[in-house]
Amino acid sequence: MFDIGFLEIIVIMVIALIVIGPERMPEVARKIGQFMGKTKRFINSMKENSEITETVRDLQNSMNLEEEKRNLESVSDTLHDDFSKIQDEFGIDQEISRPFDADEPTAFSGTQFNKAPTQPKMPTTEESPSSTPETSTKETEKTSTSDVSAPSESTPESSNKS
């Protein structure tokens, strides 16, 4: 780490033993060890932070949205120009280019696309389960003829007199 050899460490320990004394040497060695551990953890966390910021920077560079937007617009312009050339060359109607140039979407107001499907009409009266189709048609004929009422005796002249 500090490029210190084994002999140099022994020389430093002998000098520290003479200066500090044998009684306080274990306590100082513990404090130096704690300081070295904190220093290593700090250096490792700084390396991780620099790697994280470098990764974030790489992601931002790869996601350069403005450049991608410009590329997409240039492709769109190229396609529009090519389509115009083909349109002029083959004499295609102007209605085909309408989706590119239209400001408002066209509405399909009178077509089948706007009409909702109609629901089938269900009979409102309940029929008895014993009736057969033949008897039910005869009954409907009877009811339809009996529903027709006779003309009333009142005339428009008599209603005006009252």
Curated annotation (Swiss-Prot):
Transmembrane feature ranges: 1-21
BP-aspect Gene Ontology terms: protein transport by the Tat complex
Gene3D superfamilies referenced in this protein's UniProt entry, alphabetically: 1.20.5.3310
Highest rank taxon of the organism: Bacteria
One GO cellular component term noted in the UniProt record for this chain: TAT protein transport complex
Molecular-function GO terms, alphabetical: protein transmembrane transporter activity
Cell inner membrane listed as a keyword: yes
Role summary: Part of the twin-arginine translocation (Tat) system that transports large folded proteins containing a characteristic twin-arginine motif in their signal peptide across membranes. Together with TatC, TatB is part of a receptor directly interacting with Tat signal peptides. TatB may form an oligomeric binding site that transiently accommodates folded Tat precursor proteins before their translocation.
Protein's name according to its UniProt entry: Sec-independent protein translocase protein TatB
Species whose genome carries this gene: Hydrogenovibrio crunogenus (strain DSM 25203 / XCL-2)
Organism phylogeny: Bacteria, Pseudomonadati, Pseudomonadota, Gammaproteobacteria, Thiotrichales
Gene: tatB
